[in-house]
Amino acid sequence: MSASGLPFDDFRELLRNLPGPDAAALVAARERDAQLTKPPGALGRLEEIAFWLAAWTGRPPAVNRPLVAIFAGNHGVTRQGVTPFPSSVTAQMVENFAAGGAAINQICVTHDLGLKVFDLALDYPTGDITEEAALSERDCAATMAFGMEAIAGGTDLLCIGEMGIGNTTIAAAINLGLYGGTAEEWVGPGTGSEGEVLKRKIAAVERAVALHRDHLSDPLELMRRLGGREIAAMAGAILAARMQKVPVIIDGYVATAAAAILKAANPAALDHCLIGHVSGEPGHIRAIEKLGKTPLLALGMRLGEGTGAALAAGIVKAAAACHGGMATFAQAGVSNKD
């Protein structure tokens, strides 16, 4: 905690002093790319991904220790009947991750990705955002700090994902609080909300944003009022990655909402991040557009768990492999253009 005693102060200081890209590494990557055995631009976005890796790691593009970090939290707003599933499913899915039985486990095996799962006090749901703040400032800051531990032990590509019954309600409230519009524009089915459940979900988002409307101009305050533990932890992980020169792939609707908090605090806060995919959650494409990003994949997925980010990691690994492994024209004895 900072000397002033305010829990968010250290994070505000970090957000004011974000490191930028490594210009020399970027130039070196562009120069090598110009010598590879292909026409300029022939690998399309793969080339841009390689440059992005170089700029944010400060070295030639490589992915040797990719990691998927899943943050799991429970939410008091589920008491409003916003989801057909009970909150106990969150803990059950954490057990499924540990047993290797979830979709994310299979994708991690396929693409040789590490996996860490962070259980964020699942027995103690956050406050119901339609009635009170989700978290105290102290609890929110502590959870951000815990999320920063995602990169402890070393990784060179971090994929951010989540698990939490009720958290698409939270994501919709964050987006409505940040960007305005109507609740209907930001609320989608999540884990299968429809009919009366979907109506309750929309109403809950409206009530929550109305309750906290006088406190939403500060992004970190918005997060602690409308967010949740996995939101705070993901924000902390993304911020820590920036400070440690670790590129990040953001997953779906909920992870994007966490990222949006940081961008609202500093417009450059997500320059080291890619959006892995656009999900089937209706508000996600609008949220991505607000961030000024272009997703790598569009597969109609809306599972969460970091699955879209993990699939995108395979593309990022391929981009690095092409950049580092392809021969130059001189090495291959292939004639370059005149």
Swiss-Prot record:
Similarity comment: Belongs to the CobT family.
CDD domains the UniProt entry points to: DMB-PRT_CobT (cd02439)
Record EC number: 2.4.2.21
Coiled-coil intervals, chain numbering: none
Residues forming the catalytic site: 305 (proton acceptor)
Pfam families, sorted: DBI_PRT (PF02277)
Keywords, in A-Z order: Cobalamin biosynthesis, Glycosyltransferase, Transferase
Endoplasmic reticulum as UniProt keyword: no
Name of the featured protein: Nicotinate-nucleotide--dimethylbenzimidazole phosphoribosyltransferase
Organism from which the protein derives: Sinorhizobium fredii (strain NBRC 101917 / NGR234)
Family matches, as SUPFAM superfamilies: Nicotinate mononucleotide:5,6-dimethylbenzimidazole phosphoribosyltransferase (CobT) (SSF52733)
Protein biosynthesis is among the record's keywords: no
Signal peptide: none
Alphabetical GO biological process terms: cobalamin biosynthetic process
Function: Catalyzes the synthesis of alpha-ribazole-5'-phosphate from nicotinate mononucleotide (NAMN) and 5,6-dimethylbenzimidazole (DMB).
Uppermost EC category: transferase
GO terms, molecular function: nicotinate-nucleotide-dimethylbenzimidazole phosphoribosyltransferase activity
Pathway(s) this gene product operates in, as recorded in its UniProt entry: Nucleoside biosynthesis; alpha-ribazole biosynthesis; alpha-ribazole from 5,6-dimethylbenzimidazole: step 1/2
Annotated gene: cobT
Catalysed reaction, written as an equation: 5,6-dimethylbenzimidazole + nicotinate beta-D-ribonucleotide = alpha-ribazole 5'-phosphate + nicotinate + H(+)
